[in-house]
A protein has these predicted regions:
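N-terminal leader/linker segments that precede catalytic domains of diphosphate-processing enzymes
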Residues: 1-242
Length: 242
C-alpha cells in the first residue's frame, strides 16, 4: 500500500515575522541485523505541535544547560568544521550533547562513558537525559559520534530549526528502549522499509543519504567532504554539499 503523502510543515501567517531557526540536533542510531542495516525511529505523538504523527530520529532543541556541561570528550575537529558553527567548539559540543540527551529522554538509550566528575549542572526536570546519566556515573561520549548532515526548516514554517544529524553504532549504547509522551512508538526497522513510514521530507532525505552508503558508518566517516545541507527555497528542495 502506498503511503499517504502528508505535509508535516506547519504554515506561518504571512503577516508574521520569519522566525530565526533554533539550534537542534538528532541522533541517528544504526545497527546491523544479518544483511540488513536497521535504524531506530520513533513516532511522534499526534498531540505535538511540530510534526505530529511523523516518524523521526530521536532529537530536539539545544538547551542552555547543554552549553555549560563540562565533560572529558569533544567532537572530532573535522566534524566541528561541518556544523556551521564558525568552528565554535562550545556550540559544536552542545549540539552533540543535545543529541545524546534527547535520545536518553525520548528512548531510554544512552551513549555514555564512565565519568570522572559528577556533573553539577542544574536541571529543571528530573527526567533530563544528562541528569539520568549523571546518576549512573556516566557522561555523554562524543567520540562515538559521526556526522551525517544538517537541515534548516523552511521560512514558511512558524517553528524553525537548524538541525544537525549525528550518527552512532548501536553497539555503543546502553539502556532499554521505552516509549515516552513524545515518541509513542519506537522501532528498529531496516533502512529500505523505513521509507514506507509517514515521515517528513528531511527524515526521508537523510535515510536516502544513509542508503547511498548502505548504512556503513565507516564509509560515512570517510566522506566528510561531501555532507549535505537540506532546506527549501521558493517551493523547491534546496540541497548543498560541502
Amino acid at each position: 500500500m502506498k503511503k499517504k503523502e502528508l505535509n508535516f510543515t506547519p504554515k506561518r501567517d504571512k503577516n508574521t515575522k520569519i522566525p530565526r531557526p533554533r539550534n537542534a540536533a538528532s541522533l541517528v542510531l544504526l545497527k546491523r541485523s544479518g544483511k540488513d542495516v536497521q535504524v531506530l525511529l520513533g513516532k511522534r505523538s499526534d498531540k505535538t505541535r511540530f510534526m505530529p504523527g511523523a516518524w523521526v530520529f530521536p532529537g530536539g532543541v539545544v538547551d542552555k544547560a547543554d552549553y555549560t556541561i563540562s565533560i572529558n570528550t569533544s567532537l572530532n575537529k573535522n566534524i566541528i568544521k561541518k556544523l556551521a558553527v564558525s568552528n565554535n567548539i562550545g556550540t559544536a559540543n552542545a549540539l552533540a550533547i543535545a543529541s545524546i540527551r534527547e535520545t536518553v529522554e525520548e528512548t531510554g538509550l544512552i551513549l555514555g562513558k564512565k565519568s570522572k566528575n559528577v556533573l553539577t549542572v542544574n536541571f529543571e526536570e528530573d527526567n533530563n537525559g544528562i541528569a539520568i546519566m549523571s546518576k549512573l556515573g556516566l557522561e555523554p561520549d562524543l567520540t562515538k559520534l559521526f556526522y551525517l548532515g544538517r537541515a534548516i526548516t523552511p521560512t514558511i514554517s512558524p517553528i524553525r530549526f537548524h538541525a544537525r544529524f549525528f550518527i552512532t553504532d548501536a553497539k555503543h549504547l546502553t539502556g532499554k528502549i521505552k516509549t515516552t509522551n513524545e515518541l509513542v512508538e519506537i522501532e528498529w526497522i531496516s533502512l529500505k522499509s523505513a521509507k514506507k513510514l509517514q515521515m517528513a521530507d528531511v527524515t526521508e532525505f537523510m535515510i536516502n543519504e544513509l542508503l547511498t552508503f548502505n548504512g556503513d558508518i565507516l564509509k560515512i566517516k570517510k566522506m566528510l567532504v561531501n555532507r549535505p545541507m537540506f532546506t527549501w527555497k521558493m517551493g523547491k528542495q534546496w540541497i548543498t554539499r560541502k
